[in-house]
Amino acid sequence: MLRLILAILLRRLLVVIPMLLVVSVMIFVILRLLPVDPIAMIISPTAMPDEVEAMRAFHGLDKPIPMQYLIWIGNILTGDFGNAISFRDSVMNLLGETLPATIELALFALFFAIIIGFGGGLYMFHVRGTVRETVTDVTSIAMLSLADFLWASILMLLVGVHWMLLPISGRYGPEFIAPDITGFIFIDAIITADGALLISSLEHILLPALALALAFAPLIMRVLKSSLTEVMTEDYITLARLRGISERRILLRHALKNGVLPTLTLIGVQFGFLFGGTLLVEIIFSYPGLGNLMVRAIRNTDLPVIQMAALTYCVVVLASNTVVDVLYVVLNPKLRKE
């Protein structure tokens, strides 16, 4: 099994690395062709021309675009992501502060989406052929019609502002000083045995995570229901019924194992969109993650931060797809034999 997983990973790397190179070129060139001067955004209007040129040289903007790209890629390979123009900090430090927050948010959202999606999908399958099927279909379509930022606005206004049940901004309460251990606030709170910080962090992440989950869960519901409906018509399911096995046992022990594979693929593919969707949700909830950082960098035309944040999003999407490819083969006996 280990050799199989390593073979899949190696095969994926042969595809992912060229894709990342192409994406990095596109990001870099598009940003450099924008009719803006990032240095002019931060330097004093009264600065002397030689001061402007010195600033441009410090950030490597005085060189030809191909040379800038090669220097950038070379620095990335050595762990140097460059210096932010407007934040007065290294890009590595900025990513280290914000990326863990976004990963936590995306993982919580994925967890909620799977719980809601699988529960709803099994219920939709259970009530098929009844009036309740129509109700659940209409409900899932209505949920799909609302984007994640709309769910975020609804939850903020209803749960946060009107009912005042949960906080609507930040990552934890202002009375806490988060320990700087891993960057993942939940892990750090567990390591330091700080239960109050753990609860505060959970309260702050619930609304943004639910906003992302409620936009994603209906897809899981519908795909799982369709997959189970198709699997239940297979010959081995008919044979199991003839042997007197109960429908519940057939569903849980036979149908669900095969019906979940298309759903798993959907989760992997859509996780990239879910991770990208954190950008707007983070802005709405003032959540200090990668999306929030990227928007602030765009406002300041901070090219080093923008290009590294965009590349990070691409890496996460490709990595999630790779993980799903491995899981799909591990869970599918036919593919394992091939």
Task: State what each model feature region is.
Residues M1-I5, D62-F118:
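An internal, D/E-rich "acidic patch" concept
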Residues L21-M26, I65, Y69, A106-F111, ...:
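Hydrophobic alpha-helical transmembrane segments of multi-pass integral membrane proteins
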